[in-house]
A protein has these predicted regions:
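Short coil/turn connectors at secondary-structure junctions
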Residues: 7-10, 40, 67-68, 127-129, ...
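N-terminal small/polar loop signature for handling phosphorylated ligands or for N-terminal nucleophile
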Residues: 30-91
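An accessory alpha-helical subdomain
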Residues: 147-213
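Secondary-structure boundary/capping motif
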Residues: 21-24, 56, 81, 158, ...
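Generic secondary-structure signature for well-ordered alpha-helical cores
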Residues: 37-43, 49, 66, 70, ...
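Proline/glycine-rich low-complexity loops and linkers
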Residues: 56, 84-172
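Glycine-rich phosphate/diphosphate-binding loop of Rossmann-like nucleotide-binding domains
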Residues: 2-52
Length: 213
């Protein structure tokens, strides 16, 4: 973890047709946001979900990477034809899309030369100059290009990798939270909550989250 900074923010970009179609339910947004906040003092200020379409990926990469200190992407870095995140980021930043020597060796050792096919080799290709995010689960690394952290879409693999992002991040101020369980009707306390929020707006963020018993 790098030197602490007062306010550090991030965006999350979820890439995948399967999320937009409803076939797959995203589990990465909540995990990444919670991990960044509790471990790094980094606030997630925006989340977008987009399809596997090069032009849309490029547009969002450029927009969000300029807007926030960090951008975390998930999905699209696997071995199949529709995994186009790495080449899209290369085009966004106008750098070569090429084999990363260390990533190539990691994957070749993991699969063995006889089973290291073109699809698996593809997972070693990324934007030139990228730093690796090591993968203790299935070998294929994620990568960091400028301030963009690219991780896989499979939640269990992403979870196993995310600690390896920490040393590349500048830590922000830690946010502390407290939960009060009030067994009352929300509308009866809305005025008081609004008054407290207005009075302490610079240091406190109050939310009301109803539940049914």
């Amino acid at each position: 973890m790098k030197k602490k900074n007062k306010k550090v923010n991030a965006g999350i970009l979820i890439i995948g047709n399967e999320i937009l179609s409803g076939r797959t339910q995203d589990k990465n947004i909540a995990f990444i946001a919670n991990w960044l906040n509790s471990n790094c003092g980094i606030s997630v200020n925006e989340v977008r979900v987009i399809p596997d379409m090069e032009k849309i990926i490029i547009t969002n990469i450029l927009d969000l990477s300029k807007k926030f200190n960090y951008l975390f992407t998930t999905g699209g870095i696997g071995p199949t034809h529709d995994d186009i995140t790495a080449q899209s980021i290369s085009k966004a930043f106008k750098v070569k899309y090429e084999y990363h020597n260390e990533a190539f060796k990691i994957l070749e050792n993991y699969y063995g030369k006889d089973k290291f096919n073109e699809g698996r080799k593809k997972m070693a290709k990324m934007p030139k100059g990228s730093k690796l995010i090591y993968n203790p689960s299935s070998a294929a690394p994620g990568f960091i290009t400028k301030n963009v952290f690219s991780l896989p879409g499979v939640p269990s693999i992403l979870i196993s990798m995310i600690e390896n992002c920490k040393r590349f991040l500048v830590k922000g101020s830690t946010t502390h939270s407290t939960t009060l369980n009030l067994y009352t009707v929300e509308s009866t306390i809305s005025k008081q909550m609004g008054s407290i929020q207005k009075k302490y707006d610079k240091v406190v963020d109050i939310g009301s989250y109803p539940f049914f018993r």
